[in-house]
């Protein structure tokens, strides 16, 4: 008796499989005797539940069309190091089951009902870019209409791979893809289509977007494609998700403080070099900028080379260059006030060229030289008193003459030294002004270049 029962069950299975393989199926109407005010009797749908392992078609050569749609309710995170987009989606799939139908007039006016999704055949739609295990909650339900249309919705936390371009950080826009496809069914068995238009999906996503953090949704677009794998074609729908970073956090915490520090470094050129305060001030400012970069390093992407990193490198280079310039000018002043060598002729010519009106830098009005200078006897047109012939100086007069000549030579030496010191001081101030202008020019051109690159 037990063996005959087994053979009967096996015969029924092979008979059903034969009908499916031959392209023939059976449609039927659900008996409404199990319908009432408390819902439907599960036994009335047993014939549908028993077909759950098989694709619901009456002709196996006809592919099942699955319409998909989704709404993005949250952009959770964008991992620049791993190139991952974490989002939360509400996925909706709609398809027809020809084995389900009933007459609403005979079934208490019921046009649709909900039933456990585990009792129905479900499309194996997945996201190709998904980089984590599907964490869809269990025990979901699906809505079934009296015409056999099934509407199934499920929430999904999606960690998808996304090729991020962080060069324009923090003013960057990213384009990520979400590709929906079947894992098992080829184009001969399943076709994908849209349940809603793209603009409807975009508006719905913007309306229910619950996160107002670092990223905002710009828009969605879609494309259809066919994936060839192992000689089989799989239908696909590719959604392009455009998102944009909100840069206010990084502008306030990174760009503005860095700009202030560079501006203070530029203003420090107005500190007099002779006071000795410019070098310590610039060293303190440089150390403070390095501490600032160390504290803010957690806000920067850890992969790639963003443009903001180039901006910080330029700011650091400007500060180091200004410190070296100050050290150079301080050394010139030290040389000028201790043992100034004779100023080379070409430097003297360059200094005269720069001191001329409208040249390299404005010069202070020349002060009258009140120090020891040339004696009147060395001025043009003035001759030394001649000694009368036949008048030989005596010993006392010779001693006085020798002393006056030594004093005159010493005065000439002091005058030449003072003149050399003044020339070196003028040269130092001219170099300081010229290097300051070069500093401003390089700073302005660098900042303008970075801003133009950010705006492209």
Swiss-Prot record:
InterPro entries: LGIC_TM_5-HT3, Neur_chan_lig-bd, Neur_chan_lig-bd_sf, Neur_channel, Neuro-gated_channel_TM_sf, Neuro_actylchol_rec, Neurotrans-gated_channel_TM, Neurotransmitter_ion_chnl_CS. It catalyses: Na(+)(in) = Na(+)(out); K(+)(in) = K(+)(out); Ca(2+)(in) = Ca(2+)(out). This is 5-hydroxytryptamine receptor 3E. Pfam families: Neur_chan_LBD, Neur_chan_memb. Belongs to the ligand-gated ion channel (TC 1.A.9) family. 5-hydroxytryptamine receptor (TC 1.A.9.2) subfamily. HTR3E sub-subfamily. Residues 270-282, 329-433 are cytoplasmic. One of its GO terms (cellular component) is serotonin-activated cation-selective channel complex. Keywords: Cell membrane, Disulfide bond, Glycoprotein, Ion channel, Ion transport, Ligand-gated ion channel, Membrane, Postsynaptic cell membrane, Receptor, Signal, Synapse, Transmembrane, Transmembrane helix, Transport. Expressed in adult colon and intestine.
